[in-house]
Amino acid sequence: MSRLDNRAYYDDFAGWYEKERHLPYHRMLDDLEVELVERYATGKAVLEVGCGTGLLLHRTARFARHAIGIDLSGGMLQKAQARGLHVMQASATALPLATASVDVAYSFKVLAHIPDIQGALREMARVVRPGGWVIAEFYNARSLRRLIKAMKPPSAVSETTHDEHVFTRYDDARAIRSYLPPELTWVATRGIRVITPVAKVLEVPLLGTAVRWAEHRLADLPGARDAGGFLVACCQRR
C-alpha cells in the first residue's frame, strides 16, 4: 500500500478532523490530555507540537502564560488560526523557536507518525528551558488498543484517504526510553485509554459514565497506566 507524505495526509484529513471530536470518546481523550498538560503548564510558556486545528491548544491557552502551536499541515492550521491561536507551519524535526524559549513542549497523537522520532524529541528538548518539561505521547505496542487496531479495517479520514495511508509506529516503554535524548529524564507516565475496548462504549448510558470514571482513575495508577493505548512520557529537561 502506498503511503502519503505527512503533509499531504493531514491536509486531506483537515476537512474531516473535527467531524467526530464532539463524541464522548474523543472528549475523554482530550480531557485526559489537557488535564495532564495543566499540571505542568499553568502560568508557563507552552508549545504544542502538532497542534492540528487547535482543539487542545485553545484549551491550553486558557491556563498557560503564552501558548504557541506548530503543525506541518496548512489545512489544519487554517482552522487553528480561525480560533485566534498563535500558530506556525513547521516540521517537528525543525522547530522555528529559539533554544530554551519555552517551559513546556507537548505532543499528542503526532510523534507516532514521525519516522525521525529521535530528531523530533531532540528538537522538543532543545526549545525547553532547563527544569522544564517535554510531554510526549506514543502509541503503546502492548495495549488492547493495538490489538483491536490490528484486527479492524482501516478508518477513513476523508473521502479518498484512510489511516493506513500514513506512517504509524507502535512502541513499548523500552523503545521510548531509547529515543529520549540524554538531557531528558522520564519522570512520570500517564496511560490513556486503559480499558476502553471500542469508542462506542462511551456512548452507552451508565456504562459510558462508568468507563470514563475508571479511565480517569487508572490513568496514573502504576501497573494499570502501562496498559494504556496511549503512553505519555513526562520528561524533565536537565
Predicted regions and their residues:
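A short glycine-rich, Lys/Arg-flanked "PGG" loop and its adjoining helix->strand segment in the class I
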Residues: 118-130
